[in-house]
Amino acid sequence: VDSLMNHVVGRSVVELPHKSDLLTNWVSDITLDIIKDLSGYKVDLAIMNKGGIRCAMPAGDITEGLLDSMFPFDNRYMVLEMSGKDLLEALNVMASRGGDALSRGMMVTYDKSGKVLSAKLKGKKIDPKKMYKVATIDYLANGGDYMVPLTRAKRLYEDEQKYGIHVLNYVKELTAAGKQIKSVNEQRMQCK
């Protein structure tokens, strides 16, 4: 078991500090990619929680043990279909705690009280009447971290495996393709 946990499965170009935009963006972006592949749905965005990522990712070698430490919980990936109204409400919950993890294409600004001022997906405002497909984990879909708006969504897909296993496989596939872990340093939830 020790040798398995020390087994190098990938490399990170730079350090992704704990609870940083670099780390949460990487996790949200790969969640979006992985769930699209697993579910076959055209998913619009991914919502994850900073608290579910338990440690930083250092630059250099990434071991199976590190990934297991980063994602120790028994959470499963899900696809939800929800109204823009409920999505905006969920973004308000995220803003009230200083922002959280969103995938590429999402840009949210909020005020000091935690109220969303602007929420855009690929440059277009979130429409309260439109339906959106959202990738997330069962913990959030069940209302964890006060994400009650997600409990009103229709559940389209629920994976059977712990999502950390999918992250491990994603990193292994990246390595097999001769690529390293990279992230985008952008603040997708900004307090104005």
Predicted segments, located by residue:
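Intrinsically disordered, low-complexity terminal and linker regions
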Residues: 1-9, 23
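Short glycine/proline- and acidic residue-enriched helix-loop micro-motifs
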Residues: 9-18
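Feature captures C-terminal
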Residues: 21, 25-192
